Amino acid sequence: MRRIAAFAAVVLLAGSAVPASAKVVAYEGARLIVGDGRVIENATLVVDGAKIAQAGAAGEVRVPAGAARVNLSGKTLMPMIIDTHTHLSSKREDLLRDLRARAYFGVSAALSLGLDGFALLDVRKQALPGAARFFSAGRGITMPEPGRTTAPFWVTSAAEGRKAVDEDAAHKVDIVKIWVDTRDGKYQKLSPEIYGAIIDEAHKRGLRVIAHLFDLEDAKGLVRARIDAFAHGVRDKDIDDEFVALWKAHPNLVLTPNLPDRGVKVDLGWLRPGLSPEEFAKLEKANVDNPKAQAFYGIQARNLARLNATGARIVLGTDGNKPWGPHDEMQDMVVAGMTPAQVIVAATRNGAEFLRIADAGTLQAGKSGDFIVLDANPLDDISNTRRISQVILRGASVDRSKPLF
């Protein structure tokens, strides 16, 4: 449904009261999209320091005496976005810039998949002011790909695959990334024997495995081998009944669709305040209709729609380093057939659960004070996620006063 009924009587409390102090702020009068499918009209959200203390309908939330009160009538609040497939910079200064840029566009956490190495994994432990949280697959695993990056482990046997997993595990990566793709016939791809060994070893080590893939037949083999997540949907053809049945038999399997560019010219005006004139001009130059891209998008859009109809667990990912990319991806997911409400759940609660971030993904008591203040309702039009009035990260306003690039 494009509009979810409001839960006017719902109140989510962390204890019976919140002590009043200068750090307590009550945001009042906005529509609150919880992130789990519920909506509260005319809500009150009380933030104490970096945490949400209360969230519920106006009149049902007890605002502590002395709390600062912010009138957000006419606005919509939604949780900050979780991007489960990025490729962030490998230099520390650039990585920190990437994480700040994501917060600017309303992203609270990003998973970088397999091209990072191990040198910057310490950044994951840092709560950087005004910056998204960092998650990483460290070094991914693939067959040798001469001419491409050497950041992943190159393996040619099951034993080498297991050894690569062991090294990832020793560095405590968040997930193991594998590539199963010939890159248009240029390379050999991981065989079922090798990726099966990788998945088995990872599971022994308490790690999950996410796969880059292209072909339907590889997707079937990966599901049978107990893969945990797909970093893309099937891209070579429409999925069939056998694949749908396999997916249904593995209800914990997670899909990050990473839809490609739709190949149609779009309005980029919303990006202008965040970019220098030079960077904006580069985007505009590339903003053209592309019939080939339209056909490629069509295959993946149909496959996403079919899996979504089965109740598949879907999260959001962008497969790149564009900090505004999640807003484009959400639009593409709706064009593919998901409702705005479904897309928001995928981009918030589902993403947080996939990355195992216990205090993110929904606007509920006890969660981190991470939310986007929007000028319009994204349940009516998903592109309204771009109409950002303010971003609050861990209870503090993110500086959006100047261009990022």
Task: Specify the residue positions occupied by each region the protein language model found.
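Bacterial N-terminal signal peptides
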Residues: 6-16
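Histidine-rich, glycine-flanked metal-binding segment
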Residues: 32, 36-78
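Divalent-metal coordination cores built from histidine and acidic residues
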Residues: 72, 76-84, 94-209, 242-283
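Histidine/acidic-residue-rich catalytic or RNA/ligand-binding cores of hydrolases
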Residues: 92-94, 189, 219-226, 261-277, ...
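His/Asp/Glu-enriched, well-ordered alpha-helical/loop segment
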Residues: 204, 291-377
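Glycine-enriched alpha-helix->loop->beta-strand junction motifs that scaffold or abut catalytic
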Residues: 223-230, 249-254, 311, 338-339
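C-terminal cap of metal-dependent C-N hydrolases
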Residues: 347-349, 353, 368-405
